[in-house]
Amino acid sequence: MDKPASRHFSVLIIDDEPQVTSELRELLENSGYRCVTSTHRESAIASFQADPNIGLVICDLYLGQDNGIRLIESLKEVAGNGRFFESIILTGHDGRQEVIEAMRVGAADYYQKPVAPQELLHGLERLESRLHERVRSQLSLSHVNQRLEYLAESLNSIYRDIHKIKYEVHGNSQPSALRSEDSQPSAPPAPVAESQVSPSNPLFGKLSPRQQAVARLVSKGLTNYQIAYELGITENTVKLYVSQVLRLMHMHNRTQLALALSPAAMQQGSGAVVH
C-alpha cells in the first residue's frame, strides 16, 4: 500500500523512553506525518524553536524529573501569540487531577498508555483540522485588520481634504497668518508673539499647551473651522477647547478672550510691572 501524502504540520513526540518515541514515530510516519522526537525537556524546547512547522505535540506526563504539563506550558511561552500548536498528554497512570491540570494549561487531549494506534491517529487528525482552522482564522483576521487600517487612512485623507475645502471656502483660501489687513478690515490687530501673550493674563499660564494654542487663534479672530484646520483637529474638539478656555479664564465669550489677549492688554500688563 502506498504511503499517505505528507501532512502540513510536523509532530513533536516527547517521552523519556526511547522505545516509546520510536514506536510512535513509526506509526505516525506511516500515516504521512513528519516527526521529531525528544527524550527530555531541553531538547524538546530546542526542537520546537528550531522547527516552525511543528504544530502537533505528543508529550508524556512524566519525563523522569520533569513534568509534561509544565513542558507544555513552556512551549506555549516559546510560541507566544504568533504561533499555534495543539498538544496531547500521554500517561501510564489514571489520575483525574492530572487530567484536569492538563486541560487547564491547554492540552487538547489525554490518552492512557498503551495507546490504541487508530484512536491516537483519529485524535491527531481532529487536532490537525482544528489547527488548520485556527491558522485560517488568524490569516483572515490579519487580512481584515489590514483592510481596516487602509480604510482608516483613506477616511483620514478624505477628512483632511474636506477640512481643507472648508478652510478655503470660509478662510478666503489663504492661511490666516498671510491674510493682509486690507482683505480683512474687521480682523483684530496683528498677532503678537506667543512669548508676549502669556504675561498679559495670569490665568493664561494655567492653561494646557493645546488650550493656549486655541486661545491664541481665537484672539486672532479665527473661526472654529479655521482653528480646526490650523491644529489638525475636528471642529467639535475646537468648540470643547474654547469652552474650557472661557471657563478657566473666567470669561463669558470669545470677544472677552480676544480683548484679554490683545496687544493692548499685553502692554497694559507689562506696564503694571515696569515703572
From Swiss-Prot:
Phosphorylated by PprA. Gene3D superfamilies: 3.40.50.2300, Winged helix-like DNA-binding domain superfamily/Winged helix DNA-binding domain. One of its GO terms (molecular function) is DNA binding. The keyword Cytoplasm does not apply. Residues 10-128 form the Response regulatory domain. Member of the two-component regulatory system PprA/PprB involved in biofilm formation by controlling the expression of many related genes including type IVb pili major subunit flp pilin, adhesin bapA or cupE fimbriae. Functions as a transcription regulator by direct binding to promoter regions. Negatively regulates its own transcription. This is Two-component response regulator PprB. Residues 224-243 bind DNA. Residues 200-265 form the HTH luxR-type domain. One of its GO terms (biological process) is positive regulation of single-species biofilm formation on inanimate substrate. Induction: By carbon starvation. This increased expression is controlled by RpoS.
